[in-house]
Amino acid sequence: MAMKIRLARGGSKKRPHYSIVASDSRMPRDGRFLEKLGTYNPLLAKDSEDRIKMNVERVQYWLSQGAQPTDRVARFLEAAGLKEKAVRNNPKAAVPGKRMAELAKKKAERAAASAE
């Protein structure tokens, strides 16, 4: 059974409220879960203590059992100091597109020609 620590959405339309839960990865997002580990309220200010609440002991237990946090929950765990900060590297996003690469090449050729 592949365990995930993830967010389960609650609240009403345009008023989201999330529960941090430990569940089987095959279950629906808001479906059955094994344990509620905390809450996340994105509507509160970022510096509010009530924005993210977690039961640290239970989160550590599930991590020791092999549960994998989702990306957003992993960021919460990094902020709480429960997990090492993952290096996020997307080198393909920094590579210019075809058109910009052609323009840069032409600009370099013009600069080389004017330097001669």
From Swiss-Prot:
Keyword hit for Coiled coil: no
Region annotated Disordered, chain positions: 88-116
Basic and acidic residues bias (residue ranges): 99-110
Pfam family, one: Ribosomal_S16
HAMAP family in the record: Ribosomal_bS16
Cellular component GO terms held in the UniProt record: cytoplasm; small ribosomal subunit
Protein name per its UniProtKB record: Small ribosomal subunit protein bS16
Gene3D superfamilies (UniProt xref): 3.30.1320.10
GO molecular function ontology, one term from the record: structural constituent of ribosome
Assigned keywords, A-Z: Ribonucleoprotein, Ribosomal protein
Protein family: Belongs to the bacterial ribosomal protein bS16 family.
Taxonomy, superkingdom: Bacteria
Gene Ontology biological process: translation
